[in-house]
Amino acid sequence: MLNQIGKKIFLDVNEKYYEYDLKDIFEFQLIKYYVGGNYNWHCDYGEAPVRGSVRKLSMSVHLPAPKEYEGGELNLINYSNYPIMVNNNLGSTIVFDSRIPHKVWPITWGTRIALVGWANGPKLR
């Protein structure tokens, strides 16, 4: 069921904003960040598990309430090359181009949980 919901979100956002050629290949992963946990600046675009396919869209769904941890802010670099902080309210979801650099700042207290996912397709031309 989670896979179907995530797939629908990807397809709806793609149709409205990106119009990428996506294949029926979607990956999802539950990530937990404990105190000190973080993820440095990176891009998700690149080889996907299926040969000849790349990650085109990325998604992050915020699962715990912000009061359950401190730190752990998700930041993205926008197209003007400025960092923006993503809303970390319970259930907040963001879908973005996998070529956009992003990071998660270190957790200073508690545990941050996120569902992340990727929509894949042929390499961009």
Enumerate the predicted regions with their spans.
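Fe(II)/2-oxoglutarate oxygenase catalytic core
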Residues: 1-93, 99-125
